[in-house]
Swiss-Prot record:
This is Signal peptidase complex subunit 2. Component of the signal peptidase complex (SPC) composed of a catalytic subunit twr/SEC11 and three accessory subunits Spase12/SPCS1, Spase25/SPCS2 and Spase22-23/SPCS3. The complex induces a local thinning of the ER membrane which is used to measure the length of the signal peptide (SP) h-region of protein substrates. This ensures the selectivity of the complex towards h-regions shorter than 18-20 amino acids. The gene is Spase25. The chain crosses the membrane at residues 50-72, 82-104. Its main location: endoplasmic reticulum.
């Protein structure tokens, strides 16, 4: 492969975002963190429980709406009134559950991975937060032992300018450095805890 091909390949891998769009910046950084966390660590297997729960709730809400529409079509109002009333209540109840799930369970979590070894299983989670009109990107990496429930976390709160250049290009190497720093800190705590327990 020639130099031109290498340059074109590198250019295709670059991610460019509108640096003035906070939502786009956050999602681009989330994708870069997820790629670094899971792509460089084959021992981590991505889990989709949170996403599947959200999709199931959305599917149920849509199914209720479709059922109400179909029932009203075959049984015109006012005969369909009880079914429509039930459907409206069920729809908003499901939306409420979905909101609670997103606010209190997901909490900005965009990556979940399971690490299995001979001794135990550990659940890794990556979450982020970036408030509107704020340039601070808060990244939190946590690990939880599935047996005893002990949870540890490391956080990084830096300006998004630390990971994106003036042209809006996401600097994957700088993102990887930050992710590796948090991951290694948690891994070091994990090793220290295991050595203390063995002593």
């Amino acid at each position: 492969m020639g130099k031109k091909d290498e340059k074109s390949q590198q250019g295709e891998e670059l991610v460019k975002v509108n640096k003035w769009d906070g939502s786009a910046v956050k999602h681009a950084l989330d994708d870069a963190v997820k790629t670094c966390l899971l792509g460089d660590r084959p021992q981590l297997k991505e889990q989709f429980g949170l996403v599947n729960t959200r999709l199931a709730l959305c599917a149920l809400a849509v199914s209720v709406a479709i059922m109400a529409h179909a029932w009203d079509f075959t049984h015109p109002f006012p005969e369909s009134r009880p079914v429509l009333l039930f459907s409206v209540l069920a729809y908003f109840a499901l939306l409420g559950i979905l909101t609670l799930h997103s606010s209190f369970r997901e909490k900005g979590t965009f990556a979940v991975a399971l690490q299995k070894d001979k001794e135990r299983e550990r659940l890794w989670e990556a979450s982020s937060d970036m408030r509107k009109y704020d340039d601070k990107y808060l990244l939190t990496l946590s690990v939880r032992d599935t047996k005893n429930g002990k949870r540890r976390e490391q956080s990084s709160n830096k300006s998004c300018a630390a990971f994106i250049d003036q042209n809006g290009i996401v600097l994957d190497n700088l993102v990887a450095n930050e992710v590796n720093r948090l991951f290694n800190a948690l891994a070091a705590d994990k090793k220290n805890a295991s050595s203390l327990s063995s002593n």
